[in-house]
C-alpha cells in the first residue's frame, strides 16, 4: 500500500485553471464517492481551497490510481486530459507524506504560516470520514499531520507575525490600545483592503465598526457583513470623534482628512488617543496630522516595514519547522512500513500456533493421564518457547521494514512460511507414515 497525493495548486497552475477544478461543497460528496470506487484506491480525501485542489489517498497501484483520477478530473473540469496533466503534480510514498504534512502546517501556503489552512484541512478529513472514504491509514495520517501543524505553530510562532498590510494594521492597533473590546472603528472605504481589515478587527472583538464610502450601498454591504453601521460620506465628520481607530482605504487622489479636522476632534475627545492607518495610495490623510497631540498616524510604508520584517522572521521559522517536519515524516513512514509487514508477522505467528496446537494435541493423546493443570503448564511452556524463538525474527522484520530493500527480505520470509510449508502438508506426511506402519 502506498500513500499518494495528486492535484494542482497556486505553484503549478494559474487561477483560471484552478477555477475550473474548484469543488463546491455539494459536489464534494459525489467526487469522493466516484474516486473511492476506483479498484486500486482504498482510501481517499479531497482538499479544495481557492489556492489548491489536492487528492490524498492510499493505493496498491499508483499508476492506475493517477490515471483514473486524471480522467475524472478532466471530465469534471472540462479540460482535456493532456492539457490538465501539464498542471498536475503526482507524489507517492515519503514525498506524498511530506507534502501533506507541509500543507497542514501552512509551510506550502502562498502566505507561510496562514492559519486558514488548518480549518480547511480538518474540514477535508471530516467530509471524507462522513462519506466513509477514509479508514485506518488516512485517519492516522491526518491526525499526525494536524499534530505536527500544532507543534510547529506552538514552538516556532510561525503564525504570530503579521504578513498582510491589513493584518499588520490591526496588530499595530493592539500594540497601542491593548484590549480592543471597548474601541470603535471607522473604515473609510469599502474595498478589498478595508474588508480584510474589518475581518481582522471583527475577530479581535472591537466594540463597533462604522463604514463610510462614497458609494453608500457598498458601505451598507460591508457594514452588514460585520454587524456594523453604514455612514453616508457627507456625514463622515459627525462620527470621527466617536472613533478610536480610523482605517483609510479609498481611491481619492488627494487627502480627505487634514490636520484641522483632528485638532477639532482632539478637543472633542478631550485628549483620548486616535489611531489612524492610511493604507491608501496615494495617501488620503495629510502627513501633518501626525503633529496633532494624541493622534498617531501610520501609512502603508510604515506597515510594509513591519510586514517585510515579519516575512523574514517567518522564513526563518519555516526552516526550523522543516526540520521538525522531517522528523515526524520519518516517524510516520516507519509506522507505515511496519504496518505493511504486519500481515507477514501475523502469518508467521499463526503458523507457529497451528504447529503448537497440532503437536500438543498429539502429545496429550499419547499422555491421557495428564490432568488439566499439567496440560495448561505444558501449553504455557511451549508458548513461551515460541515467543522466545519468534522474538528476534519479528524484530528483524520490523527493522528491515524501513530499509530500501525491505521487499527482498519480506519476500524470502513470506516464501518460507507459504503454503508449501503449511500444516496440511505436515499432517499428510504423518498420515502416510502411519499407513506404512500399519
Swiss-Prot record:
**Which Gene Ontology MF annotations are present?**
glutamyl-tRNA reductase activity; NADP binding
Positions bound to substrate? 49-52, 109, 114-116, 120
Note one Pfam family from the annotation: GlutR_N
**Catalysis performed (reactions):** (S)-4-amino-5-oxopentanoate + tRNA(Glu) + NADP(+) = L-glutamyl-tRNA(Glu) + NADPH + H(+)
Catalytic residues of the enzyme: 50
Q: Which UniProt keywords apply?
A: NADP, Oxidoreductase, Porphyrin biosynthesis
List residues binding NADP(+).
189-194
Gene Ontology biological process terms in this record? protoporphyrinogen IX biosynthetic process from glutamate
- Site positions (Important for activity) are 99
Q: In which pathway does it act?
A: Porphyrin-containing compound metabolism; protoporphyrin-IX biosynthesis; 5-aminolevulinate from L-glutamyl-tRNA(Glu): step 1/2
Record EC number: 1.2.1.70
Keyword NADP listed? The answer is yes
InterPro entries, per the entry: 4pyrrol_synth_GluRdtase, 4pyrrol_synth_GluRdtase_dimer, 4pyrrol_synth_GluRdtase_N, GluRdtase_dimer_dom_sf, GluRdtase_N_sf, NAD(P)-bd_dom_sf, Shikm_DH/Glu-tRNA_Rdtase
Question: How are the domains described in the entry?
Answer: Possesses an unusual extended V-shaped dimeric structure with each monomer consisting of three distinct domains arranged along a curved 'spinal' alpha-helix. The N-terminal catalytic domain specifically recognizes the glutamate moiety of the substrate. The second domain is the NADPH-binding domain, and the third C-terminal domain is responsible for dimerization.
Record's family? Belongs to the glutamyl-tRNA reductase family.
Q: What else does UniProt say about it?
A: During catalysis, the active site Cys acts as a nucleophile attacking the alpha-carbonyl group of tRNA-bound glutamate with the formation of a thioester intermediate between enzyme and glutamate, and the concomitant release of tRNA(Glu). The thioester intermediate is finally reduced by direct hydride transfer from NADPH, to form the product GSA.
Q: What does this protein do?
A: Catalyzes the NADPH-dependent reduction of glutamyl-tRNA(Glu) to glutamate 1-semialdehyde (GSA).
Q: How does it assemble?
A: Homodimer.
NCBIfam families in the record, alphabetically?
Answer: hemA, PRK00045.1-3
What is the designated name of this protein?
Answer: Glutamyl-tRNA reductase
Species of origin: Persephonella marina (strain DSM 14350 / EX-H1)
Annotated gene: hemA
Amino acid at each position: 500500500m502506498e500513500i499518494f497525493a495528486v492535484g494542482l495548486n497556486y505553484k503549478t497552475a494559474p487561477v483560471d485553471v484552478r477555477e475550473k477544478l474548484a469543488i463546491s461543497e455539494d459536489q464534494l460528496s459525489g467526487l469522493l464517492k466516484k474516486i473511492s470506487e476506483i479498484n486500486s484506491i482504498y482510501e481517499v480525501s479531497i482538499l479544495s481551497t481557492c489556492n489548491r485542489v489536492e487528492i490524498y489517498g492510499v493505493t496498491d497501484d499508483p499508476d492506475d490510481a493517477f490515471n483514473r483520477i486524471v480522467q475524472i478530473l478532466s471530465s469534471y473540469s472540462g479540460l482535456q486530459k493532456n492539457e490538465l496533466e501539464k498542471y498536475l503534480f503526482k507524489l507517492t510514498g515519503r514525498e506524498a507524506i511530506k507534502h501533506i504534512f507541509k500543507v497542514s502546517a501552512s509551510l506550502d501556503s502562498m502566505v507561510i504560516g496562514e492559519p486558514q489552512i488548518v480549518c480547511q484541512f480538518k474540514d477535508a478529513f471530516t467530509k471524507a470520514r462522513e462519506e466513509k472514504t477514509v479508514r485506518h491509514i488516512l485517519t492516522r495520517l491526518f491526525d499526525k499531520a494536524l499534530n505536527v501543524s500544532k507543534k510547529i505553530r506552538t514552538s516556532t510562532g510561525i503564525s504570530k507575525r503579521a504578513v498582510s498590510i491589513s493584518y499588520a494594521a490591526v496588530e499595530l492597533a493592539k500594540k497601542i490600545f491593548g484590549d480592543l473590546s471597548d474601541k470603535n472603528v471607522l473604515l473609510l472605504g469599502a474595498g478589498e483592503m478595508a474588508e480584510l481589515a474589518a475581518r481582522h478587527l471583527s475577530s479581535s472583538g472591537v466594540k463597533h465598526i462604522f463604514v463610510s464610502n462614497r458609494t453608500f450601498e457598498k458601505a451598507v454591504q460591508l457594514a452588514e457583513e460585520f454587524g456594523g453601521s453604514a455612514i453616508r460620506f457627507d456625514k463622515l465628520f459627525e462620527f470621527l470623534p466617536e472613533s478610536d481607530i480610523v482605517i483609510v482605504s479609498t481611491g481619492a487622489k488627494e487627502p480627505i482628512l487634514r490636520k484641522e479636522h483632528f485638532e477639532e476632534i482632539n478637543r472633542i475627545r478631550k485628549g483620548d488617543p486616535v489611531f489612524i492607518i492610511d493604507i491608501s495610495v496615494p495617501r488620503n490623510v495629510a502627513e501633518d496630522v501626525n503633529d496633532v497631540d494624541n493622534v498617531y498616524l501610520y501609512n502603508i510604508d510604515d506597515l510594509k516595514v513591519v510586514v517585510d520584517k515579519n516575512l523574514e522572521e517567518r522564513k526563518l521559522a519555516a526552516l526550523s519547522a522543516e526540520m521538525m517536519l522531517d522528523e515526524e515524516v520519518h516517524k510516520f513512514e516507519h509506522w507505515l512500513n511496519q504496518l505493511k509487514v504486519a500481515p507477514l508477522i501475523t502469518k508467521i505467528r499463526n503458523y507457529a500456533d497451528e504447529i503448537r496446537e497440532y503437536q500438543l494435541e498429539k502429545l496429550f493423546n499419547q499422555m491421557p493421564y495428564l490432568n488439566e493443570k499439567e496440560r495448561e503448564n505444558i501449553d504455557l511452556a511451549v508458548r513461551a518457547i515460541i515467543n522466545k524463538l519468534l522474538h528476534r525474527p519479528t524484530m528483524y522484520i520490523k527493522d528491515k521494514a524501513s530499509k530500501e530493500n525491505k521487499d527482498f527480505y519480506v519476500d524470502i520470509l513470506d516464501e518460507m512460511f507459504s503454503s508449501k510449508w503449511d500444516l496440511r502438508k505436515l499432517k499428510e506426511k504423518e498420515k502416510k507414515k502411519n499407513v506404512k506402519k500399519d
